[in-house]
């Protein structure tokens, strides 16, 4: 039988006191899912209607709640997960939930209905609660627990007005459940939004969870690691992102907002295998002694304190480095530069006419102009030129309709964004249709992008367009300009001259689309000062005198 529910004594309640538990539908989903996991469920089904404000339901096949404990379920600080300990000292938490506030908060903010039955119990109990009013009755139900929270904040109009749109809340809920799938991959998961299945996962290992959340192509590019205290997967070096949003960590089964030290430990393990400024995909489950971490420092319990963070970070770094060392890691060769296409010269930019002097380290151009020495980052400059060229060409031709629409795998998060911004994407030639079951159909592509020498072009375009950036058009152009741009080791004098010519025609030649500078300028006076010389020649004015 399940552990009975009891009300915590005041000294324990003070230890676990937290801020507001339920401030949005996402909080309800998280708290109910944690309860299902703590109950040992092997199947968890979540239904969300109206962005969660109309209804959130979580159904599990876990241990259930004994009939005699059901009336206490919506009481504040009533829980089966902690017992009264010493009146001083810290708590040792071994479950995801422990405060006994989730059901109480849900009943205060909306209408709560709970139906539950332990497997060994004859008949189920049903509880309805709204505010402090509680009603319990007998019913029939399968083993497990179903919790429904409806009309959230209906009695709190001020709070209701501050809620995000239904689409935005659904996007965050799907992202949250994706993290639970990644760290609890051995369970059956199902998310339904307004009657439409959004996420379905059958029991699998970490690689299978990556396939569910990020698609089979990503799953095929991850390496498995299993060391004492650290288990999971990390991506091969070719699967990287500019952001760290696909670096996932859990401590004792709890998905957490990782401290920077853990993210840095993973990145450091790649050493020179990882391009600067990029991050890998990783899903890492960390195991520590319960007394060595504290989840009670934030209402959402997603920020935890680790007693020996440096030691944990070192263990993570060694585990990731070991996984990478055990596999051959080969990179694909990038595309080459093409001469700039002729077009009317822009009126803005004011980039000087530079004379190429030489190439340094097959990446930097040394040039002179206006009496000064210029150092040009060829990759950033080429990236800027490609970005502006793609931007000019994007609206000049009708979208290219694919002969056969391509099916692509979408994450639940991407599916939610597709529903938000599908019309905006069609406005500049990108037509993506939701095909159901985590798939999307790519029907048209902007003609300017169709012939770019970018591996997995369609996948890259769709992934970037449905990322979290505020301007999907700009994000797509910036990424497609970066991928084929010149890399270190590809530069020679001929390509350097083409880069300078292309940069001179840019409207904004001074930075790449990601904000990095394209050029550095050194005057002769700067050089003379650095070398301790007392004067310089006024070459810029055509005089050879020392000033």
UniProtKB/Swiss-Prot annotation:
One of its GO terms (cellular component) is mismatch repair complex. Keywords: DNA damage, DNA repair. SUPFAM superfamilies: ATPase domain of HSP90 chaperone/DNA topoisomerase II/histidine kinase (SSF55874), DNA mismatch repair protein MutL (SSF118116), Ribosomal protein S5 domain 2-like (SSF54211). It comes from the Bacteria. One of its GO terms (molecular function) is ATP hydrolysis activity. One of its GO terms (biological process) is mismatch repair. InterPro entries: DNA_mismatch_repair_CS (IPR014762), DNA_mismatch_repair_MutL (IPR020667), DNA_mismatch_S5_2-like (IPR013507), HATPase_C_sf (IPR036890), MutL/Mlh/PMS (IPR002099), MutL/Mlh/Pms-like (IPR038973), MutL_C (IPR014790), MutL_C_dimsub (IPR042120). NCBIfam families: mutl. This protein is involved in the repair of mismatches in DNA. It is required for dam-dependent methyl-directed DNA mismatch repair. May act as a 'molecular matchmaker', a protein that promotes the formation of a stable complex between two or more DNA-binding proteins in an ATP-dependent manner without itself being part of a final effector complex. Belongs to the DNA mismatch repair MutL/HexB family. HAMAP family: DNA_mis_repair. This is DNA mismatch repair protein MutL. It comes from Deinococcus radiodurans (strain ATCC 13939 / DSM 20539 / JCM 16871 / CCUG 27074 / LMG 4051 / NBRC 15346 / NCIMB 9279 / VKM B-1422 / R1). The lineage of its organism: Bacteria, Thermotogati, Deinococcota, Deinococci, Deinococcales.
């Amino acid at each position: 039988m399940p552990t009975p529910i009891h009300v915590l004594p005041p000294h324990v309640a003070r230890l676990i006191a937290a801020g507001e538990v339920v401030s949005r539908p996402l909080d309800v989903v998280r708290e109910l899912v944690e309860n299902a996991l703590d109950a040992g469920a092997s199947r968890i089904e979540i239904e969300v209607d109206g962005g969660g404000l109309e209804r959130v339901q979580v159904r599990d096949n876990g241990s259930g709640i004994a009939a005699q404990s059901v009336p206490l379920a919506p009481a504040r600080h009533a829980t089966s997960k902690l017992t009264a300990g010493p009146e001083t000292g810290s708590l040792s938490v071994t479950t995801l939930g422990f405060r006994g506030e989730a059901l109480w908060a849900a009943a205060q903010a909306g209408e709560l209905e709970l139906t539950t039955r332990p497997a060994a119990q004859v008949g189920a109990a049903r509880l309805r609660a709204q505010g402090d009013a509680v009603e319990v009755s007998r019913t029939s139900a399968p083993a497990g627990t179903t919790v429904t929270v409806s009309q959230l904040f209906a009695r709190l109009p001020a709070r209701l007005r501050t809620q995000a749109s239904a689409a935005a809340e659904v996007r965050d809920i799907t992202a949250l459940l994706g993290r639970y799938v990644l760290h609890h991959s051995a369970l059956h998961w199902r998310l339904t939004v307004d009657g439409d299945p959004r996420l379905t996962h059958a029991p699998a290992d970490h690689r299978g969870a990556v396939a569910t959340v990020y698609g089979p192509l990503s799953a095929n590019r991850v390496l498995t690691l299993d060391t004492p205290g650290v288990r999971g997967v990390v991506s091969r070096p070719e699967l990287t992102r500019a952001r760290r949003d696909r670096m996932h960590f859990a401590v004792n089964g709890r998905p957490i907002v990782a401290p920077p030290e853990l993210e840095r430990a993973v990145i450091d393990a790649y050493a020179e295998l990882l391009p600067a400024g990029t991050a890998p995909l990783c899903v890492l489950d960390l195991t520590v002694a319960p007394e060595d971490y504290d989840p009670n420092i934030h209402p959402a319990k997603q920020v935890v304190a680790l007693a020996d963070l440096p030691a944990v970070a070192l263990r993570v770094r060694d585990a990731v480095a070991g996984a990478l060392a055990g596999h051959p890691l080969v990179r694909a060769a990038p595309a080459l530069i093409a001469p700039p296409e002729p077009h009317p010269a822009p009126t803005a930019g004011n980039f000087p006419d530079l004379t190429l002097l030489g190439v340094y380290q097959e990446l930097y151009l040394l040039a002179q102009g206006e009496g000064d020495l210029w150092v040009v980052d060829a990759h950033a400059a080429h990236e800027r030129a490609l970005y502006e060229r793609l931007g000019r060409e994007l609206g000049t031709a009708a979208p290219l309709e694919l002969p056969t629409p391509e099916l692509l795998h979408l994450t639940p998060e991407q599916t939610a964004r597709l529903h938000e911004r599908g019309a905006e994407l069609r406005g500049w030639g990108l037509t993506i249709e939701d095909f159901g079951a985590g798939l999307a159909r790519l029907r048209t592509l902007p003609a300017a992008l169709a012939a770019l020498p970018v591996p997995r072009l369609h996948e890259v375009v769709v992934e970037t367009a449905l990322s979290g950036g505020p301007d999907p058009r700009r994000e797509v152009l910036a990424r497609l300009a970066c991928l084929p741009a010149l890399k270190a080791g590809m530069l020679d004098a001929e390509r350097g001259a083409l880069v300078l010519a292309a940069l001179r025609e840019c409207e904004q030649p001074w930075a790449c689309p990601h904000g990095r500078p394209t050029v550095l300028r050194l005057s002769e006076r700067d050089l003379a000062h650095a070398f301790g010389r007392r004067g310089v020649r006024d070459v810029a004015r055509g005089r050879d005198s020392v000033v």
